[in-house]
Every structure is written in C-alpha cells, then in structure tokens.
Design a protein with these regions (language model features):
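Extracytoplasmic metal-acquisition and chelation regions
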Residues: 19-294
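Short, low-complexity disordered leader/linker segments with a strong preference
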Residues: 1-30
Length: 294
C-alpha cells in the first residue's frame, strides 16, 4: 500500500493548486461519474444514460484485484460528482473516498448491503443477477441524490435495465433447476454468490485470488470431485491464463469453457460490442452446457 499512499499524497498536493472547471460537470454539462472497474461503469451508464459522462478508473484487460490508483487517477477522481465502486474488490477505494470528500465527490458502494450481511471475502456480487439488480438500484439512488433535477430519467433508465437483469435471473433459474449436475469447476472463486442464489455449488481451482497457485492436494481433490460427479468441463476466465484450467481438464479427460467474471473487458470484447448483459447471457449458456454434461 506504500505505492498508493505516495500517489495519494502527490495527488492531494496537486489539488491544492486547484484543478479548474466546474466540479462534477463535463464540458457538455453532463454529470461526471467515476467508476472503479467495468461492471460498475456499465451500471452507471445504464442508469445515467445521456445525462452522465462515465469513465472507468481500471482500464480494459486489467485484473482489478491488485490494481492501485496513480496520482493522476486520484486527481481525476476529485473532479467527479459521483464515484461508484463495488466494495471489497478495491482496497484503495475507501482511503480515496476519504481523500476527496472535501471536493464534493459523492461515493456509492454499490455492494454495501451485501458487504454488511455476507462474507466480505467474496465481493463478486455483480455475477449474481439478483445481487446485480440491487447494485443498480444503489447507483440509481446515488444519482438521484446528486442530480435530483433528472430523477425521473434515472428512475426510468434503472427500471428498464433491472428488467433486463431480471430476464437473466429467470434464464439462470431455469438452467439451475433443470441441471443434471449441480456443481461446477472455476479458475477462481468468483461465482460463489451466483452459486448460492441459484442452488448450485462452485469448486474453485485457485481460491478468491486469480493469481493464487493451487496445492497438489487441492488439485487431487478437484479431480476426485470431477470423477465422482461426472463433471466434463473446467471453466477459465478471459483476463487470466487458462494454463491451470487446461492442465486439470486434460488430466480429467474434460474440456474447457469460459465463465467470465466480468472484472474487465478484453480489447476484443470491446471491439465486438460486448457488455454486461451479453457476457452474462454467454455465461448462462456455458453453465447450461457444463451442468448438463453436453
């Protein structure tokens, strides 16, 4: 965290000289919104529509768990009207929020309700459609507070987007109810909330950190689970090397599929027009394949 503190002090020094411009508004009058990483930015754009200018602090193709902001990042954050973050994924967020509080930045921890109720070690709430809808509602509430003049638009946008998330919920519920196999193998334990909300069980290769290395005993246990339950697929994700997933799949005579934790878009995904809803659709399709041993 020394790197973060150095950047924080430098950014605060820059702010003392004044940044210029209207706080929280872009040149075209849109409300400036900072989002910590991809799903938070997606939710902010969905709720804000044409009334907001959203920028993502953690760029495309970057794994967010170990990212830390630079002085430039913090200086830009201080110009935002609203800062949207998940909670749990961004250990730097709360110190940053405290640092820019005097600049009028309104922070919303989209997953706050779940951070208070559930195991804080797994903050991947956005991967369960049911919890994602709650996070979108939290973003809506923050925007209405920051910009009450356009509350009706934010309400309409949020309702429309939540309806689309609810459609994902219905599809996933149907897949889970009809599944022949109730557990699945993932690279890292990002899908615990999805599994819990839909009556499934996640078995992870590398725990909550996508960079962790599994022990030989853990690998043997996973192979045993796969054999006992007839699991024919091992999921890997887009921003982390598939090497270990491929090794386990080969040892078990299984195949690999993508289960995207949506922590960031790849460049290819951005060019293809991917978004949260489309990627979650593919996740559900791949879960259907894996849970039925197709």
């Amino acid at each position: 965290m020394n790197k973060f503190l150095t950047a924080l002090l430098f950014a605060l020094a820059l702010l003392c000289f004044g940044c210029g411009g209207q706080q929280g508004a872009s040149a075209d009058g849109k409300m400036q919104v900072a989002a910590s990483f991809y799903p938070m930015a997606e939710f902010a754009r969905a709720v804000g529509g044409d009334r907001v200018a959203v920028y993502t602090m953690i760029g495309d193709g970057i794994e967010p768990h170990d990212w830390e902001p630079s002085a430039r990042d913090l200086t830009r954050l201080a110009k935002a009207k609203v800062f949207v973050y998940n909670g749990g994924v961004e250990p730097w967020a709360q110190p940053a929020v405290a640092a820019v509080a005097d600049d009028g930045v309104q922070a919303v921890e989209a997953g706050q309700a779940f951070m208070q109720q559930l195991d804080k070690s797994d903050p991947h709430f956005w991967l369960s459609p049911r919890k994602a809808a709650v996070e979108v509602a939290a973003v809506h509430d923050a925007f209405v507070k920051a910009d009450p003049e356009h509350a009706a638009e934010y309400k309409q946008n949020a309702a429309a987007y939540i309806a689309k998330i609810n459609a994902l919920d219905e599809k996933l519920m149907a897949v889970a109810q009809n599944a022949k196999i109730k557990n699945f193998i993932t690279t890292h334990a990002a899908f615990g909330h999805l599994a819990a909300d839909y009556g499934l069980r996640q078995e992870s290769i590398m725990g909550l950190s996508p960079q962790a290395e599994p022990s030989p005993a853990a690998l043997n246990k996973l192979l045993g689970v796969m054999q006992a339950d007839g699991i024919k697929y091992v999921f890997f994700e887009t921003l982390v090397s598939p090497r270990i997933a491929e090794t386990i799949a080969q040892a078990a005579g299984a195949e690999t599929l993508v289960l995207d934790p949506l922590e960031g878009l790849s460049e290819a995904g951005r060019q293809n027009g991917d978004d949260y809803l489309k990627i979650m659709e593919r996740n559900i399709e791949n879960l259907n394949i894996a849970l039925n041993g197709k």
